[in-house]
Amino acid sequence: MSETTQNEAPVAAQGASQHSNIVGRVTQVRGAVVDVQFEGTLPHILDALHVTFNGQTVVLEVAQEIGEHEVRCIAMDTTDGLMRGTEVVATGGQITVPVGPGTLGRILNVIGEPIDERGPVKSDKRYPIHRKAPSFDEQAAATEILVTGIKVVDLLCPYLKGGKVGLFGGAGVGKTVIIQELINNIAKAHGGVSVFAGVGERTREGNDLYYEMQDAGVIKLGEDTTEGSKVALVYGQMNEPPGARARIALSGLSLAEYFRDEEGQDVLFFVDNIFRFTQAGAEVSALLGRIPSAVGYQPTLATEMGALQERITSTKKGSITSVQAVYVPADDLTDPAPAATFAHLDATTVLNRSIAEMGIYPAVDPLDSTSRSLDPKIVGEEHYQVARDVQRILQTYKSLQDIIAILGMDELSEDDKQVVARARRIQRFLSQPFHVAEVFTGAPGKLVSLEDTVRSFKAIVAGEYDHLPEGAFYMVGSIEEAVAKAEKMKETA
């Protein structure tokens, strides 16, 4: 990929072929879809075109060739005010984004333009947003655990370095808060760079995240520099056209690939929300006139998801560890969008509304959440055994709940009563105060080491803390804090 400067067209690749500077005209505008007619050579599929109207330049991406002289394009910005007959110029290359250290601490849009009002991005290199996945011989197998400091995650569904993690949950169960906590914890403990792609989510949350990152020191803003910043942000929020929302994840991924391939870093790539990527693809697909498949999704759902996910991997140079929030429509995990995402993930962290309703946060379902790294060869025999014991106790409690609801606790055997008591303590101990939620709760956040997590749960499973009240286990870090809380409860009783 040849180098370009910031002053050149924000989209065109330099040294473009005979396909650059071809001029066409708009023949039809249907919302985000624009048809353009050319007299001679047609631009390639996925090429970027520029159309200037009302004093603004909008980028179009070629999606289909619909005739000998006509292409159908997706607009990356609003087409309000665009008229038939307007001149369109082909750039001869794909949409490209600036990459490199200059992007850290900045907010970019889908075509790589800064939207944080801090001037142009200091970068002398650009990557196209559509890139090939690393070849088979370039990839590296990852078996190292990424410690997050969140008890329920580290114990029951540990994340792999260079792996892909899905955060599944319906509306309002806490996906974004967990992502913010992970960015906070891992930026502090891990020290590497992160890229955050805001795909079709609330602009307010994107704004909050930007200021929270400044407060946490993850983004450092100087007079005209962002030196020392650890994260680059790319936003295509829910008020933007479907073209921008369908491509913003690819723009963010190109930024992450630079740090992996050119600088050999272990990069964290956050996507909030991968469902909106699929949703935008469905909107675009319908506008392009494709026949929808199951539940109205695009027929190319699996292909589009695969093209994105296959680029997120570990190579011999570095790794990209991805954490993706997945909105689950109507809490239905069999919906084609979350189901297509499941196939690519190494770990799934499922958030459950019934757990959130009990006031247990993070509302991670300890029985539904899975990880292929929960294996004695990777996490060690002790960790594996403790995790399985915790799940066994919680599963037994779940199966006893119907009996308890009908007959009451008194009808249970002594062994079952003991299991229920321990399960309720474990359930509460899986809750944890978050640093990013301090402003709402007033409770200081806790980052718990993996050793403390395994040791604490091992002791609870063994019955060493059966004498403590259930309330002592709620919203604490390590087991020592639960003991101290029990003492305090005894004093105030």
Swiss-Prot record:
Gene3D superfamilies: 2.40.10.170, Bovine Mitochondrial F1-atpase, Atp Synthase Beta Chain, Chain D, domain 3, P-loop containing nucleotide triphosphate hydrolases. Its main location: membrane. It catalyses: ATP + H2O + 4 H(+)(in) = ADP + phosphate + 5 H(+)(out). GO terms for cellular component: plasma membrane; proton-transporting ATP synthase complex. It is found in: Cell inner membrane. It is a peripheral membrane protein. GO terms for molecular function: ATP binding; ATP hydrolysis activity; proton-transporting ATP synthase activity, rotational mechanism. Keywords: ATP synthesis, ATP-binding, Cell inner membrane, Cell membrane, CF(1), Hydrogen ion transport, Ion transport, Membrane, Nucleotide-binding, Translocase, Transport. ATP binds at G169, G170, A171, G172, V173, G174, K175, T176. Its EC number is 7.1.2.2. F-type ATPases have 2 components, CF(1) - the catalytic core - and CF(0) - the membrane proton channel. CF(1) has five subunits: alpha(3), beta(3), gamma(1), delta(1), epsilon(1). CF(0) has three main subunits: a(1), b(2) and c(9-12). The alpha and beta chains form an alternating ring which encloses part of the gamma chain. CF(1) is attached to CF(0) by a central stalk formed by the gamma and epsilon chains, while a peripheral stalk is formed by the delta and b chains. Produces ATP from ADP in the presence of a proton gradient across the membrane. The catalytic sites are hosted primarily by the beta subunits. Belongs to the ATPase alpha/beta chains family. This is ATP synthase subunit beta. It comes from Gluconacetobacter diazotrophicus (strain ATCC 49037 / DSM 5601 / CCUG 37298 / CIP 103539 / LMG 7603 / PAl5). The gene is atpD.
